[in-house]
């Protein structure tokens, strides 16, 4: 099987590519624009494989997408290419509209034109797998807002869409496009919506890698608001396994939610990281003393939590990592891969960090 992966140099995309090349006999065509968050060093251990090809291209480039489909003749598409950071979407939404909505449209059309010319067997087996986020659902009631006797709700595959940020609105739009191409044109699509990912090779603008690296450098550990926002944390390699299971075994037209069963307050995640660093690389004072509370993000969702029962029941997937095992692996990875970290932390990254956090003190 040959799988066209978009965004395969990004955080989740590179985990998917590594999983496919290292654990299956399938081939990968990796299409990536190589924005600030795309890093080919994350694919160093698979880049020499005969089953791996890299295409430096923008999914918004229709002629390039048509050429790639015609040249490589994929059996499936896993569409992960996206702008994904909420803070960046607030200060610069245009890139999110262009990549996440227009780019998905261009890719859908390229896939549809290619798929329509396939023979019947290949048509039936072809899949267009669109990888999305639980943020399209908005947020859920927080424990502080409900009676303690009430069972807290979870996002399911039938939860209504209510995106809160430019990022989640752009992903919701792309989800709707993908489902429309299934209903209107018959393109065999699948959508997955995941909870917050963490793990190795994560670009250090997101909470967990930012906290690890700031802690090690003696910098402040910025916490939005009171830090009581709750997220369901999914180890990225568990997610990669789930995505491969969906593209190879999932049913066209279906949606599958993918979660880690690990609801944690942001402040508790940060405290856990500090305690691990105190254990592994102790210093005179606890890393907890570097925690600093900053102004909250505009429209910050208070709680996300995924009901992943469907994918477990239908496809037999479940996460292998607990949060405790996964976060330890993550901290140890960053401690052991300082060269990768140094290479991704460019001047542009430093400027963005200063712009985003200094104004929130």
Curated annotation (Swiss-Prot):
Q: What's the superkingdom here?
A: Bacteria
> Which residues are recorded as binding substrate?
84, 133, 196, 206-207, 222-224, 231, 266, 296-300
Which cofactors, if any, are listed as required? NAD(+)
From the UniProt record, list the reaction(s) this protein catalyses. Answer: dTDP-alpha-D-glucose = dTDP-4-dehydro-6-deoxy-alpha-D-glucose + H2O
Pathway given for this chain reads: Carbohydrate biosynthesis; dTDP-L-rhamnose biosynthesis; Bacterial outer membrane biogenesis; LPS O-antigen biosynthesis
Does the record's keyword annotation contain NAD? yes
Keyword Lyase attributed: yes
Q: Which UniProt keywords apply?
A: Lipopolysaccharide biosynthesis, Lyase, NAD
GO BP term (any one): dTDP-rhamnose biosynthetic process
Q: What is its EC number?
A: 4.2.1.46
| Entry's Gene Ontology cellular component terms | cytosol
Enumerate the active-site residues: 134 (proton donor), 135 (proton acceptor), 167 (proton acceptor)
Please share the entry's free-text remark on the cofactor: Binds 1 NAD(+) per subunit.
Query: Which positions bind NAD(+)?
Result: 11-12, 32-35, 58-59, 80-84, 99, 167-171, 197
Q: Which residues cross the membrane?
A: none
Functionally, this protein is described as follows:
Catalyzes the dehydration of dTDP-D-glucose to form dTDP-6-deoxy-D-xylo-4-hexulose via a three-step process involving oxidation, dehydration and reduction.
Q: What interactions and quaternary structure are annotated?
A: Homodimer.
Per the similarity annotation, which family is this? Answer: Belongs to the NAD(P)-dependent epimerase/dehydratase family. dTDP-glucose dehydratase subfamily.
Protein name as it appears in the record: dTDP-glucose 4,6-dehydratase 1
Q: Which organism is it from?
A: Escherichia coli (strain K12)
